[in-house]
């Protein structure tokens, strides 16, 4: 868990998520950067939209953390997802899981199995 008074924030929550994963030696990309067949595990982080909180002057920003493993490494998908989730615990309370997680999906374009985990961040409306 981060200490808000000591944490060195980036310019955006997306950058904080990216940096946290990168610092844990997890290969991480922005959407559209990684191309070609998946030959080892990696993560893609994307901003997944936002909505206004119904009772407060707050926006709820969503982030998709997409975990990929090669097609022949399906058995490593769950351990990799858990590893990513454990690493991102360091960013609590800035981001929290929404409880939404996709079933595993085989993406023929990248020859990879993928699971997406959704995280949220509450941000005061300016």
Describe the residue ranges of each PLM region:
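A short, polar/charged loop/turn motif at coil->beta-strand junctions and beta-hairpin connectors
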Residues: 38-39, 59
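A short, hydrophobic beta-strand-centered structural micro-motif
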Residues: 39-48
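Short acidic low-complexity segments
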Residues: 29-36
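Charged, amphipathic alpha-helical segments and their flanking helix caps
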Residues: 1-29, 47-126
């Amino acid at each position: 868990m981060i200490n808000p008074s000591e944490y060195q924030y980036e310019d955006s929550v997306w950058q904080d998520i990216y940096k946290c994963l990168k610092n844990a030696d997890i290969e991480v990309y922005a959407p559209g950067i990684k191309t070609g067949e998946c030959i080892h595990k990696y993560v893609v982080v994307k901003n997944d939209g936002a909505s206004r909180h119904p009772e407060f002057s707050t926006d709820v920003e969503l982030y998709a953390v997409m975990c990929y493993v090669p097609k022949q490494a399906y058995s490593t998908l769950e351990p990799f997802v858990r590893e990513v989730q454990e690493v991102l615990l360091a960013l609590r309370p800035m981001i929290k899981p929404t409880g939404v997680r996709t079933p595993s999906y085989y993406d023929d374009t990248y020859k990879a199995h993928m699971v997406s985990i959704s995280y949220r961040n509450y941000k005061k409306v300016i």
